[in-house]
Design a protein with these regions (language model features):
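N-terminal secretory signal peptides
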Residues: 1-47
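Sequence context surrounding c-type heme c attachment/ligation sites in exported
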Residues: 42-177
């Protein structure tokens, strides 16, 4: 069985970039993961594939039959701090990210032929986070040491922080009323 724990996740910039996200394979089969990621018409990812758009969220392809409903993908909500990674939540169709969004519900439209991997043309709804923001998060992953910020990254991170504050405030108000 494929063992996935907090040590399975590392500095996002040490993974392999593919367009605007990063991939790895915890079983060492990176060439097959890259072949799937780069297949123009879509492909099924091999077991052990790890996909991350931002340091705090990941999806890992499990063994065939592990979770047929999710295409055998397990979703992870991560906490990253310095060199440490902790798993905040993990699972299949039931996992929500820290903003209350259901991971699988977002990825479900990309079922075929994209193996549940969202990109602009894969049928998934757009997320309220710009490419500049995800890039800034990737370049500032605290597990990687010094941030490699580019022009505009500080502003993008500020705007993202404001979105997070608004989202958590709305959620808190919703719980009260």
């Amino acid at each position: 069985a494929l063992a996935v724990d907090a040590q399975s996740f590392r500095c996002i910039r040490e993974m392999t970039p593919v367009r605007h996200f990063y991939v790895d394979n915890v079983l060492g089969n990176l060439p097959a993961t890259l072949a799937a990621a780069n297949a123009p018409g879509g492909a099924v990812y091999p077991p052990g594939s790890v996909i991350q758009l931002v340091p705090t969220e990941a999806m890992v392809k499990r063994e065939a039959g592990f979770s047929p409903a999710t295409g055998d993908w397990e979703f992870f909500e991560l906490e990253v701090d310095g060199q440490q990674t902790a798993i905040r939540a993990r699972g299949f169709a039931e996992v929500n990210n820290r903003f209350g969004g259901n991971c699988f519900a977002c990825h479900a439209p990309a079922r075929q032929p994209w193996d549940f991997v969202c990109e602009d043309s894969h049928g998934c709804e757009a997320i309220p986070v710009s490419r500049q923001m995800t890039g800034a998060l990737q370049r500032s992953d605290p597990r990687c040491g010094e941030p490699e910020l580019q022009s505009g990254d500080r502003w993008a991170l500020f705007k993202l922080q404001a979105l997070v504050w608004i989202g958590t405030t709305k959620a808190a108000i919703g719980r009260i009323f």
